[in-house]
Amino acid sequence: MSDPQGDAPQLTHFVGGQPRMVDVSAKAPTTRTARAEAWVLLPPESRAALLAGQTPKGDPLSVARLAGLAGSKRTADLIFLCHPIPVTSAEVDVTLKDAGIHITALVKTTAPTGVEMEALTAVTVAALNVYDMLKATSKAIEVSGVRLLSKTGGKSGDYQAAERPPQP
């Protein structure tokens, strides 16, 4: 968390060098959103199997969507210092592109803390499920480019990531 005067960031999850969950009980619930992305880079043999509908475990794109939705709701179980918050909406898009499989998630809540980690967890869990579903076709599949694209709401204000070209 940054100081509004531009001073050095404060580490809010540590007190006396020990990890702790930040107390958000005094914060009012507000509407917050976060959008994240990830890429799954496919070697030619994995891409060919996907396009031919010959993936050993079924449709990885559909499974990835469901996995991403589940990941957004289970973030507090996986990221130790995250608060369990109500995910009021989650959308996960999984699209085959020339550069690979592009995964995006948009997560919303009305809570005293944000949903950035929920969006990032959604795309990461979705990407890992794609890897699992396609690993029989190649071990050279790569998960790449996991990042926060935007966030709205909260004390730290809105954020918009810089544009960048698709992953190679």
UniProtKB/Swiss-Prot annotation:
Keyword Lyase in record: yes
UniProt keyword annotations, A-Z: Lyase, Molybdenum cofactor biosynthesis
Top enzyme class: lyase
S-S pairs: none
Active site per UniProt: 132
A Pfam family: MoaC
GO biological process, one term: Mo-molybdopterin cofactor biosynthetic process
Catalytic activity: (8S)-3',8-cyclo-7,8-dihydroguanosine 5'-triphosphate = cyclic pyranopterin phosphate + diphosphate
Single annotated GO MF: cyclic pyranopterin monophosphate synthase activity
The organism's place on the tree of life at top rank: Bacteria
SUPFAM superfamilies recorded: Molybdenum cofactor biosynthesis protein C, MoaC (SSF55040)
Pathway: Cofactor biosynthesis; molybdopterin biosynthesis
Positions bound to substrate: 81-83, 117-118
Its EC number(s): 4.6.1.17
UniProt family annotation: Belongs to the MoaC family.
Assembly behavior: Homohexamer; trimer of dimers.
NCBIfam families: moaC, PRK09364.1
Purpose: Catalyzes the conversion of (8S)-3',8-cyclo-7,8-dihydroguanosine 5'-triphosphate to cyclic pyranopterin monophosphate (cPMP).
Name by which UniProt lists this protein: Cyclic pyranopterin monophosphate synthase
The species this protein was found in: Deinococcus radiodurans (strain ATCC 13939 / DSM 20539 / JCM 16871 / CCUG 27074 / LMG 4051 / NBRC 15346 / NCIMB 9279 / VKM B-1422 / R1)
Gene: moaC
